């Protein structure tokens, strides 16, 4: 009886293991890759003027990584053309940028190097300008990110500190601290947003916040720098405490059938209203 009981217990154990193993294991499906709207070209016009003021075109490699861009200023004589070339590795992204070559004091293009950590987030942004007598090197560093990978503070070379506020996936405020005539001061940027999702690359929000002409490089690296907002920018207000001055820009969009902004109307409290026409890599 004892032997039979042992056999029955063993059989029961085997049966329960088999029953458990027969249950299919359904793997968790991978999260869908985020949709990206790759920009091929941005053209800028003064509203009411058919003559183009500025153009920037972007080129990508086979992996859809940005490989180069060309800026054109059609209203200059001769027409000014500025090229930027990018190279990528796991450790850094480097931009060779000819922005300063129109000035005779520079002997070669500027270099912007974005160092990356093991997670692919920015750890340092260094820019180098080459003069006949040497180099001028500046660095932005001490990046700190929240749990969502959004930048919350940094140490730029041109300010003492930067603090960023996020709400519902959008960067709503940036405070830059600095000293002016021995007194602590601040520049405060506040942003509001539309309900339209921002899928643009380069990041249209950062491009518009600095406004053309001339790229400021961060629109190229918003994901690595933790600067991408979920929605498209509606307004951008800049206030300086030392002067009390405030400027404001507002943005209105026309979208195509895919929900991509193809035209942006910019109203500027200090400048001429402008229109940006956007062309995408994929039609």
Language-model region placement:
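Buried hydrophobic residues that stabilize the cores of well-folded domains
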Residues: 20-283
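C-terminal motif of bacterial Sec signal peptides marking the signal peptidase cleavage site
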Residues: 14-16
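Sec-dependent signal peptide recognition
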Residues: 2-7
């Amino acid at each position: 009886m004892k032997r039979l009981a042992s056999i029955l217990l063993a059989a029961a154990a085997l049966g329960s293991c088999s029953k458990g193993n027969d249950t299919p294991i359904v793997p968790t499906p991978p999260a869908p890759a985020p949709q990206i709207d790759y920009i091929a070209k941005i053209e800028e016009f003064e509203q009411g003027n058919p003559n183009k003021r500025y153009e920037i075109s972007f080129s990508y490699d086979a992996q859809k990584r940005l490989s180069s861009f060309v800026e054109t200023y059609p209203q200059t004589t001769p027409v000014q053309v500025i090229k930027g070339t990018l190279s990528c590795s796991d450790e850094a992204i480097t931009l060779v940028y000819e922005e300063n070559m129109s000035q005779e004091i520079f002997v070669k293009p500027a270099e912007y190097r974005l160092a990356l950590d093991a997670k692919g987030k920015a750890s340092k942004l260094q820019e180098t300008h080459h003069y006949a007598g040497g180099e001028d090197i500046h660095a932005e560093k001490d990046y700190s990110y929240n749990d969502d990978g959004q930048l919350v503070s940094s140490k730029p070379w041109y300010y003492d500190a930067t603090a960023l506020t996020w709400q519902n996936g959008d960067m709503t405020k940036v405070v830059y601290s600095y000293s002016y005539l021995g007194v602590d001061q601040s520049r405060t940027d506040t942003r509001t947003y539309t309900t339209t999702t921002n899928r643009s690359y380069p990041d249209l929000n950062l491009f518009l916040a600095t406004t053309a002409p001339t790229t400021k490089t961060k629109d190229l690296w918003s994901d690595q720098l933790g600067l991408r907002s979920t929605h498209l920018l509606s307004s951008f207000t800049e206030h300086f405490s030392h002067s009390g001055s405030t400027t404001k820009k507002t943005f209105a969009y026309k979208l195509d059938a895919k929900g991509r902004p193809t035209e942006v109307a910019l109203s500027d409290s200090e400048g001429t209203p402008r229109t940006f026409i956007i062309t995408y890599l994929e039609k």
